[in-house]
From Swiss-Prot:
It comes from Haemophilus influenzae (strain ATCC 51907 / DSM 11121 / KW20 / Rd). This is Uncharacterized protein HI_1710. It comes from the Bacteria.
Length: 46
């Protein structure tokens, strides 16, 4: 992945760059924002 992802939950905020990973526990709700190869990404998990 070229770019950066920002993950937010009620208790946690993470910023991931190329080559970094994060494990998200089952049932956790996260908002995802990012810029990947020039495209903006906005999503909610689950």
């Amino acid at each position: 992945m070229k770019g950066q992802l920002n993950l937010r939950s009620e208790t946690t905020a993470l910023s991931l760059k190329q080559g970094e990973v994060a494990f998200i526990t089952a049932g956790a709700a996260y908002e995802v924002e990012g810029l990947i190869e020039g495209y903006a990404v906005v999503a909610k998990l689950p």
